[in-house]
């Protein structure tokens, strides 16, 4: 349930990458948005939130409970999602500035995503926040500048309800 999932999101993501609880819950009414809770042997273990946008899948959040990390479970879930959706995939990642962010990028790379170096700014997730510098990773391949601009524009308008130019 949402009330099981949201605490995992709060523990796995910085406040700059997560909406307020009721704003996150309101997304459940969005036609392109899907929130999945994954159970392992009956126990809630992981979650991912996706947006099915035109010809690509945008993964907004992906988190595995701490006790299920580092055993290949997250990778198995990601691979299953990719196999099921059969469409290009996009995920935002933090800049590779420290060991943790480099490890996250490496996780996605091991599952076939490519780090794109185009400067990307995530619109604010909460009132009063500024933009967040991130990068896009894509599968099955790196994207050209035209595709990057199209993905960025669609993510900003559909996911963040932001119509400006960042």
Residue ranges: model-predicted function:
Residues 1-23, 39, 134-136, 146-166:
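Short amphipathic alpha-helix that is part of the acyltransferase structural core
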Residues 27-37, 130:
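A short helix-loop-beta-strand connector motif used in the catalytic cores of GNAT acetyltransferases and
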Residues 37, 42-52, 56-63:
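Conserved beta-strand in the GNAT
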Residues 64, 70-83:
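Conserved acetyl-CoA-binding loop-helix of GNAT-fold acetyltransferases
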Residues 85-100:
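Conserved GNAT acetyl-CoA-binding A-motif
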Residues 92, 105, 109-129:
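Conserved catalytic-core motifs of GNAT/GCN5-like acyltransferases
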Residues 112, 126-129, 133-139, 143, ...:
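Intrinsically disordered, low-complexity, charge-dense segments enriched in Lys/Arg
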């Amino acid at each position: 349930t949402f009330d099981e999932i949201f605490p995992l999101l709060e523990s796995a993501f910085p406040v700059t990458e997560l909406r307020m609880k009721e704003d996150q819950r309101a997304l459940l009414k969005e036609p392109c948005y899907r929130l999945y809770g994954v159970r392992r042997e009956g126990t809630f273990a992981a979650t991912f939130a996706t947006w099915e946008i035109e010809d690509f899948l945008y993964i907004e959040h992906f988190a595995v409970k701490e006790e299920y990390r580092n055993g290949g479970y997250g990778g198995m879930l990601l691979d299953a999602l990719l196999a099921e959706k059969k469409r290009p995939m996009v995920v935002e990642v933090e800049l590779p500035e420290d060991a943790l962010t480099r490890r996250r990028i490496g996780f996605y790379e091991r599952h076939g995503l490519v780090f794109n170096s185009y400067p990307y700014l995530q619109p604010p997730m909460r009132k009063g926040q500024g933009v967040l510098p991130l990068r896009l990773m894509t599968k099955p391949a790196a994207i050209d500048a035209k595709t990057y601009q199209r993905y960025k524009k669609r993510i900003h308008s559909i996911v963040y309800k932001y119509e400006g130019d960042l």
